[in-house]
C-alpha cells in the first residue's frame, strides 16, 4: 500500500471517470463532527495534482448533508458527466461536472433538483450501459428510475414482493441494462427487471450464526447472473456470492470481518478483486471467485462506511470512515518498513516521530497480481528464428510454447546445402546448384564458372587452354621459324639466326641432331688470317680459355665466345652471357634472359600485361617453389587490376591469377567491394525471396561465403583464416554467422565461427550467444594416449639423486620378480620426486632390481599372489561397483603379518573417515589362499618385504588402534591421503591388508623369540603398497603454496629413489646427531624413526579405507633411508645433513568469493556446466546413509568451481583433461573417465588440491547410481 492522500472530512465520496480522477466529497448525514459542526459542504479534490497542497479545487456549502454521491460517465451534452447527490431531506440534485469545475459556481452548475422521495435518499447509482439513467433508493422502500437527459417524472421499477422500510444499496447489472438489485434493512436482496416492471428474485440467507441482513450489493463485472451481497449484522458479518441460476444458496461464503459489512465494491477491471469495509474499522481485499481473503489494509479509528475503486484507475481506491478521514491509497504495498521510518536514537525524538508516522501496513495473506498487470497472452520473437508465445489454459495456468518461425524458406535451402557441404567436405553440389540457377549478373556467373574449372582441372592446368589456344607472339623483323635442314646449317653467320636455331633445337629435342665430325686437312695459320685470329688461335691452343674468351669479346666474335664458354667455368659463361644481353635488347633477348636465369621476375614486373596468359604460363613453368609461385601470381593479378582495359575483363583475369596464387585476401577484397552493387541488383531483380534490403544483404553475404568456402575446399585450406588482410573477411563471416543464427541455423553458424581467429573481436560474445540459444556446450572430444612397453622409462641408477624416477617393482635381497606387462604407463612428475638441496641420499645397497611396468587401467590383469584377497582393491577402483574375481596362482609363500584388532571394533572406531564406503556392491565370497611354506631368510639383517595375507602364523605384540572418532580430524588432514595422485604407481593394482602397518613405517627386524618365523620372500609380482593414512611425502617447492588438502605422494618402495622430505605434519627423521626444528606434530602420524634401533611398534595403525583394506608396508632398513644400499658398499650411516627448512609461500587471497560463478572463463564453462548437471542428477539418488559422503563430494566439486572462477591452481592442460573427463562422464564411459582422472592426478599432482577426490567420487557414484 502507498498512501496517496488523506482528506480530513467525514464525508461520502464519488470518483470521476478520468484516468487521473477527481474526487467529489460531501458531508455525510448522521455523523457528528469532532467540532460539532453542523454545516455541510460539497468539495472537489485533485489528489494527483502536485500544486494543490491538500486543498480542494472547489468547495461550496449546501443546505443539507449527503447520504451518497454518484458521478456518471460522459454522455451526450455532458462531456464530464453528471454529479448526483442524495440528500437527507429527500432531494436528489444534479450538477454538470464540467461547468462546476470551470465556473466553480454550484448554482450555475446545477441542472435539476428532484423531490420525488418522501424521505431521506440513502443510495443512488448510474447505469453503466445507459449512462444517463439513474436509480435512487431511500426510506419507505422507495426506488425511482431517473432519465437525466429529459428529467421527466421518475418511474418506479414495480411492486416489491416484500416491502422493506429502507433501501440502503442499489446496483445495476453490468451486462444487462434493465436489471438492477437493491438491498435494505429488510434482510434480503431484491432483483428487479425494468422490462417486466417487477421484482423477479428474492435472495436471503440464514446461517449457523443467524440471519444475514444484506446492507449492500454489487454485480459481477462481466457475468450477468452473478452478484455479491454483504451483511451488516454484527452476529453474521458475511460476504456471499450468488449465481442467480441457483438462487437457493450462495456459491461462496467469505468470512473475515468481525462486525457488520457496510460497503462493497467489485472491481470492474478484475473480477478477482473485491474490496469491503465495515463496522470493525477494517478494509479488506478479497478474491470473490475463489472465495478467499487476499489481504487487509490498515484499520481506521471508527467505522469504515464507504470504500470504492477509482473507475478508470483501479489500482487506486478510497475509504471513508467516521473518524473524519478519507484515505486514498494503492492496492500494492511498496512502502518501506516502519523500522526504517522511525530510526531515531533519542527517546524524545522517537516518540515525536512515532506519533506522526504511519505505523500500520497492509498484511497480505495471498499474493495475487491484478488483471491489468497480468498478460493473458504474449508473443515475442527470439534469437534463432524462434517465436515464443504465452497463453492461458482453462485453469488459468500459463502455457509457454516455442516454435520455429521461418519467413523465407529459400534462404533455408541455401544454408542447408552449406551445412551438408561442410559435413561431407564436398562443395561440388554448391557449384552445380549455382550454375544451374539464375545469376544476378555476368560477373557472378564468371566467378562460379571459374570455380567449377578450378575444381575440375586444378591450378596446374588452369592456364593451359588460354595459352595453348592463343597466338604466339613474334619478334619484330623476324620471319617464321626456319626448318632444320641439316647439321651444316645449324649455326648461321648471324647471331640472331644462331639463337633461333638454338631455341628450335631446344624445343624439338636433340635426338635427330647429327653430330659434327671434322674431316679433311686444314692449316692452323693462314696468311689471310688477321692478327687477332692468330692471337686467338694461340690462346686456344695454349688452353688459355679465359684470355681467349676476352679476345673474342674484344673482337666482337660473340659466337666464338659462346662456343669457348660451353665447357668453361661459370664465371666465363656469365661473362659471355652478360656481354650478349648488353648488345641485344629486343623482346626475344628479354625472354632469353628470364629463361637463362631461371627467374621470371623481369617478365612479371615488366612484360606487357596484355600477354598475361603467357606470363602466367612462364610462372607455372619456372617457379617450382610454392611460395614463389603464389607470390608471382598475386603480383601478376595486381598488375592486371592496375592496368588499362575493360573493368569486367580485368577483374576476371585478376581473379583467375589470384585463385591460382592462393591470394584469398585479394579475391575476397574484390568480392566484398562488389557486395553493395550486388545487393542493389538483387533488390531490383524479380526474385520472390528478395523483398527487403535485409533479404538482399543475406543473399549477397551467402553468395560471398559460399565462394570463399568453396575455394578453401578446392585448395585444401583448413583451419582458421590467417594473414594480414583477413579482417574484412572475418567481419563478413561474423555477420553471416549472426544472420544464419538468427534463422535458427546454429550448427552452420558455429562452423563459420570456427574459421575465425580465436582473438577476433566479437567472436566470443557471438559464440556465447549461439551456445545459450542452442542450449548446448562445445566440448572437444579428447583421446586417451597411452605408451606401449617400448616407450617405458629406462631404469636409473639409485645413486643418482636427480635422475628421472621410474616405476619399479618391489625387490628383495634374494632376487627379483616379473610383473604382467602393461600398455599404459602414466607419466611421472619429476618435480614431485626430486630431492631438496642439502639433503642428499646416501649410497644405497640395491640388490637385483627388475622394472615393473605400471598396470593398464583399461585392462584387468589376474593376480599372481596366493595371499592376495579374492578381490584386490585398486586405489582408483569404484567402491560402489561389484568387483570381478581374479584368478590366483600358487607361488612361493610369504610370511603372514601379525594379527590386528578385531574387525568389528576396528570398523566402529574409524566410522566416518574420509574414504568412500564399499557397501553399494554385493559382498563377494572370499577365496581361501593356498597354504604357504616358511623358508628362512638368508640375510636376517637385511630389510625384508612385508606383504599382506589373510592369515598370519606368527605372533606379534598388538598394534596401536586407529584414531578414535571423538578426536577432531582437522589436526591430521595432511596425513590422510584421499588419493595417491602424486604416487608414480597410482595406476597399478593395489594389494592391501586391513591389519598391516602403514607403508614406510613398518617395524624393524624383530629380536629372536618374538616372531616364530622370519619373513619370507616371493618371486610373484607384488603391487606397490599404499596406505591412505600414511604420512605424506611432499617435494619442497618454493613456488607453490602447500595445500593441506592436496593428496600427498606415498612413501617409496625398494628400487625407487624416494626423497626424505619433512612435511608440515610429520617430524623429520634425524640423520646422525644433527637436529632441526621440526614442524608441528600430527597426533595421528607415526613418530619419527630412529636411525640406530627403531622400535618395532613406533607407529600406530591408521584407520583403513572405508569399504576397502590397507596396503601392506614396504621394508624399513636400519639406515636413514628405506632403500637398501647398493651392492659392494658397506652400509654405514652417512654424515648427518640437516633437512631443508620448510619454505613458506604466502597464498594470495582469491579474487572472487566462494560460490561466485560469474567469472568462470569461457574455456572452463563446459566443465562447470557438465559437472553441475551430473551432480544435480545424482544427489537426489544418494541413499540417506551415505548423505555425508554426498555432501563432502558436493563441497569438493564446488571448491573446483571456485578455482575455475578465480582462474588459479589449474593449468590449461588440467582444464583440457577435465573437459575430457566430463565428455566421458556424459557418454557414461566410466572407465575412460576414471583413467583420465588418474592421468590428471599423475601429470598435475600439484594442482589436484582438495577437489580431485570430489571428481573421483562423482565418477564412482555416477557409475553406481
From Swiss-Prot:
Gene3D superfamilies: 1.25.40.1030, Functional domain of the splicing factor Prp18 (1.20.940.10), YVTN repeat-like/Quinoprotein amine dehydrogenase (2.130.10.10). GO terms for cellular component: COPII vesicle coat; endoplasmic reticulum exit site; endoplasmic reticulum membrane. Residues 473-486 have a biased composition (Basic and acidic residues). GO terms for molecular function: structural molecule activity. Residues 462-490, 786-1163 are annotated as: Disordered. Coiled coil: none annotated. It is a peripheral membrane protein. Residues 927-936, 1129-1142 have a biased composition (Low complexity). Residues 861-878, 968-993 have a biased composition (Polar residues). Keywords: Cytoplasmic vesicle, Endoplasmic reticulum, ER-Golgi transport, Membrane, Protein transport, Repeat, Transport, WD repeat. GO terms for biological process: COPII-coated vesicle cargo loading; endoplasmic reticulum organization; positive regulation of ER to Golgi vesicle-mediated transport; positive regulation of protein exit from endoplasmic reticulum; protein transport. It is found in: Cytoplasmic vesicle, COPII-coated vesicle membrane; Endoplasmic reticulum membrane. Residues 1080-1089 have a biased composition (Pro residues). It holds the Pfam family WD40. Belongs to the WD repeat SEC31 family. This is Protein transport protein SEC31.
Amino acid at each position: 500500500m502507498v498512501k496517496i492522500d488523506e482528506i480530513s472530512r467525514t464525508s461520502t465520496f464519488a470518483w470521476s471517470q478520468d484516468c487521473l480522477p477527481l474526487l467529489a466529497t460531501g458531508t455525510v448525514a448522521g455523523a457528528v463532527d469532532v467540532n460539532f459542526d453542523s454545516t455541510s459542504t460539497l468539495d472537489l479534490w485533485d489528489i494527483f495534482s502536485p500544486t494543490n497542497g491538500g486543498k480542494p479545487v472547489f468547495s461550496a456549502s449546501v443546505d443539507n448533508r449527503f447520504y451518497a454521491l454518484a458521478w456518471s460517465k460522459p454522455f451526450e451534452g455532458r462531456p464530464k458527466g453528471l454529479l448526483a447527490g442524495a440528500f437527507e431531506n429527500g432531494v436528489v440534485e444534479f450538477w454538470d461536472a464540467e461547468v462546476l469545475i470551470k465556473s466553480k459556481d454550484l448554482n450555475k452548475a446545477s441542472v435539476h433538483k428532484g423531490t420525488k422521495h418522501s424521505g431521506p435518499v440513502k443510495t443512488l447509482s448510474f447505469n453503466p450501459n445507459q449512462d444517463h439513467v439513474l436509480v435512487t433508493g431511500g426510506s419507505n422502500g422507495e426506488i425511482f428510475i431517473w432519465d437525466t437527459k429529459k428529467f421527466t417524472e421518475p418511474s418506479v421499477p414495480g411492486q416489491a414482493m416484500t416491502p422493506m422500510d429502507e433501501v440502503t444499496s442499489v446496483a445495476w447489472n453490468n451486462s444487462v441494462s434493465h436489471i438492477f438489485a437493491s438491498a435494505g434493512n429488510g434482510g434480503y436482496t431484491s432483483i428487479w427487471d425494468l422490462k417486466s416492471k417487477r421484482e423477479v428474485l428474492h435472495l436471503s440467507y440464514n446461517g449457523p450464526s443467524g440471519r444475514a441482513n444484506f446492507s449492500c450489493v454489487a454485480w459481477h463485472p462481466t457475468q450477468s447472473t452473478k452478484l455479491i451481497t454483504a451483511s451488516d449484522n454484527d452476529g453474521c458479518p458475511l460476504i456471499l456470492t450468488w449465481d442467480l441460476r441457483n438462487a437457493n444458496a450462495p456459491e461462496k461464503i467469505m468470512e473475515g470481518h468481525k462486525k457488520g459489512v457496510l460497503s462493497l465494491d467489485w472491481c470492474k477491471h478484475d473480477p478477482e478483486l473485491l474490496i469491503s469495509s465495515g463496522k470493525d474499522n477494517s478494509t479488506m481485499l478479497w478474491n470473490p471467485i475463489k472465495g478467499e481473503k487476499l489481504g487487509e489494509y490498515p484499520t481506521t479509528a471508527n467505522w469504515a462506511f464507504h470504500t470504492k475503486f477509482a473507475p478508470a484507475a483501479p489500482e487506486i481506491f478510497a475509504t471513508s470512515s467516521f473518524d473524519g478521514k478519507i484515505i486514498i491509497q494503492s492496492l500494492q504495498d511498496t512502502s518501506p518498513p516502519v523500522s526504517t521510518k522511525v530510526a531515531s536514537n533519542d527517546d524524545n525524538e522517537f516518540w515525536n516521530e512515532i506519533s506522526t508516522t504511519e505505523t500500520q501496513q497492509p498484511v497480505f495473506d495471498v499474493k495475487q497480481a491484478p488483471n491489468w498487470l497480468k498478460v493473458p497472452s504474449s508473443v515475442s520473437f527470439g534469437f534463432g528464428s524462434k517465436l515464443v508465445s504465452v497463453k492461458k489454459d482453462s485453469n488459468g495456468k500459463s502455457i509457454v510454447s516455442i516454435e520455429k518461425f521461418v519467413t523465407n524458406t529459400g534462404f533455408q535451402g541455401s544454408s542447408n546445402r552449406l551445412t551438408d557441404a561442410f559435413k561431407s567436405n564436398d562443395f561440388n553440389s554448391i557449384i552445380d546448384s549455382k550454375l544451374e540457377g539464375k545469376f544476378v549478373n555476368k560477373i557472378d556467373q564468371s566467378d562460379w564458372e571459374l570455380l567449377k574449372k578450378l575444381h575440375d582441372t586444378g591450378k596446374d592446368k588452369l592456364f593451359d587452354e588460354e595459352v595453348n589456344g592463343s597466338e604466339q607472339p613474334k619478334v619484330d623483323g623476324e620471319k617464321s621459324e626456319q626448318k632444320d635442314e641439316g647439321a651444316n646449317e645449324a649455326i648461321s653467320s648471324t647471331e640472331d639466326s644462331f639463337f633461333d636455331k638454338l631455341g628450335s633445337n631446344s624445343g624439338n629435342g636433340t635426338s635427330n641432331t647429327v653430330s659434327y665430325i671434322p674431316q679433311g686437312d686444314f692449316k692452323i695459320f693462314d696468311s689471310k688470317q688477321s692478327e687477332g685470329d692468330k692471337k686467338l688461335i694461340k690462346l686456344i691452343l695454349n688452353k688459355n680459355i679465359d684470355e681467349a674468351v676476352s679476345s673474342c669479346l674484344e673482337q666482337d666474335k660473340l659466337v666464338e665466345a659462346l662456343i669457348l664458354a660451353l665447357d668453361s667455368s661459370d664465371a666465363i659463361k656469365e661473362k659471355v652471357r652478360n656481354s650478349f644481353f648488353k648488345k641485344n635488347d629486343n623482346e626475344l633477348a628479354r625472354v632469353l634472359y628470364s629463361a637463362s636465369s631461371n627467374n621470371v621476375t623481369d617478365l612479371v614486373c615488366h612484360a606487357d600485361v596484355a600477354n598475361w596468359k603467357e606470363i602466367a604460363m612462364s610462372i607455372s613453368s619456372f617457379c617450382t617453389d610454392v611460395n614463389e609461385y603464389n607470390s608471382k601470381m598475386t603480383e601478376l593479378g595486381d598488375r592486371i587490376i592496375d592496368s588499362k582495359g575493360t573493368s569486367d575483363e580485368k577483374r576476371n583475369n585478376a581473379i583467375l591469377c589470384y585463385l591460382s596464387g592462393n591470394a584469398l585476401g585479394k579475391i575476397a577484397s574484390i568480392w566484398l567491394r562488389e557486395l553493395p552493387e550486388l545487393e542493389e541488383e538483387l533488390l531490383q531483380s524479380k526474385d520472390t525471396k528478395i523483398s527487403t534490403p535485409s533479404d538482399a544483404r543475406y543473399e549477397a553475404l551467402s553468395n560471398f561465403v559460399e565462394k570463399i568456402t568453396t575455394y578453401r575446399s578446392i585448395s585444401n585450406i583448413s583451419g582458421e583464416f590467417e594473414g594480414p588482410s583477413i579482417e574484412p573477411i572475418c567481419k563478413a563471416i561474423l555477420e553471416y554467422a549472426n544472420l544464419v543464427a538468427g534463422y535458427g541455423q546454429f550448427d552452420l553458424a558455429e562452423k563459420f565461427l570456427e574459421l575465425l581467429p580465436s582473438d577476433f573481436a566479437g567472436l566470443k560474445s557471438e559464440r556465447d550467444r549461439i551456445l545459450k540459444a542452442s542450449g548446448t556446450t562445445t566440448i572437444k572430444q579428447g583421446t586417451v594416449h597411452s605408451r606401449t612397453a617400448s616407450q617405458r622409462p629406462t631404469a636409473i641408477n639409485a645413486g643418482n639423486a636427480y635422475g628421472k624416477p621410474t616405476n619399479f617393482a618391489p625387490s628383495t635381497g634374494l632376487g627379483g620378480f616379473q610383473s604382467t606387462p602393461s600398455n599404459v604407463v602414466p607419466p611421472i612428475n619429476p618435480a614431485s620426486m626430486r630431492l631438496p638441496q642439502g639433503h642428499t641420499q646416501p649410497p644405497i645397497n640395491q640388490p637385483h632390481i627388475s622394472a615393473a611396468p605400471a598396470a593398464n587401467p583399461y585392462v584387468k590383469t589376474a593376480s599372481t599372489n596366493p595371499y592376495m584377497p579374492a578381490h584386490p582393491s585398486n586405489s582408483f577402483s569404484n567402491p560402489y561397483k561389484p568387483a570381478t574375481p581374479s584368478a590366483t596362482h600358487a607361488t612361493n609363500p610369504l610370511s603372514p603379518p601379525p594379527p590386528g584388532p578385531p574387525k568389528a571394533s576396528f570398523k566402529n572406531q574409524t566410522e566416518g573417515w574420509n574414504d568412500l564406503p564399499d557397501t553399494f556392491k554385493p559382498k563377494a565370497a572370499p577365496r581361501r589362499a593356498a597354504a604357504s611354506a616358511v623358508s628362512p631368510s638368508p640375510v636376517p639383517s637385511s630389510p625384508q618385504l612385508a606383504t599382506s595375507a589373510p592369515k598370519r602364523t606368527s605372533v606379534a605384540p598388538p598394534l596401536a588402534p586407529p584414531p578414535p572418532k571423538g578426536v577432531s580430524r582437522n589436526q591430521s588432514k595432511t596425513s590422510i591421503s584421499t588419493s595417491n595422485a602424486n604416487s608414480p604407481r597410482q595406476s597399478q593394482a593395489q594389494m592391501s591388508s586391513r591389519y598391516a602397518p602403514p607403508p614406510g613405517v613398518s617395524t624393524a627386524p624383530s629380536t629372536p623369540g618374538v616372531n616364530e618365523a622370519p619373513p619370507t620372500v616371493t618371486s610373484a609380482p607384488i603391487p606397490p603398497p599404499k596406505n591412505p593414512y600414511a604420512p605424506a611425502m611432499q617435494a619442497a617447492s618454493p613456488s607453490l603454496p602447500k595445500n593441506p588438502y592436496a593428496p600427498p605422494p606415498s612413501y617409496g618402495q625398494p628400487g625407487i629413489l624416494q626423497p626424505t622430505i619433512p612435511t608440515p605434519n610429520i617430524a623429520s627423521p634425524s640423520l646422525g646427531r644433527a637436529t632441526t626444528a621440526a614442524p608441528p606434530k600430527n597426533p595421528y602420524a607415526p613418530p619419527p624413526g630412529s636411525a640406530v634401533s627403531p622400535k618395532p611398534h613406533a607407529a600406530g595403525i591408521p584407520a583403513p579405507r572405508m569399504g576397502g583394506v590397507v596396503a601392506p608396508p614396504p621394508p624399513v632398513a636400519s639406515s636413514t633411508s628405506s632403500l637398501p644400499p647398493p651392492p659392494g658398499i658397506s652400509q654405514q650411516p652417512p654424515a648427518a645433513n640437516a633437512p631443508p627448512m620448510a619454505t613458506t609461500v604466502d597464498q594470495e587471497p582469491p579474487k572472487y568469493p566462494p560460490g561466485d560463478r560469474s567469472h568462470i572463463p569461457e574455456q572452463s564453462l563446459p566443465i562447470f556446466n557438465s559437472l553441475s548437471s551430473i551432480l544435480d542428477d545424482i544427489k537426489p539418488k544418494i541413499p540417506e546413509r551415505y548423505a555425508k559422503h554426498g555432501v563432502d563430494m558436493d563441497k569438493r566439486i564446488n571448491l573446483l568451481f571456485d578455482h575455475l572462477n578465480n582462474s588459479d591452481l589449474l593449468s590449461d592442460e588440467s582444464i583440457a583433461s577435465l573437459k575430457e573427463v566430463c565428455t566421458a562422464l556424459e557418454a557414461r564411459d566410466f572407465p575412460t573417465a576414471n583413467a583420465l582422472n588418474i592421468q590428471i592426478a599423475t601429470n598435475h599432482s600439484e594442482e589436484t588440491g582438495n577437489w580431485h577426490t570430489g571428481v573421483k567420487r562423482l565418477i564412482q557414484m555416477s557409475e553406481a547410481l
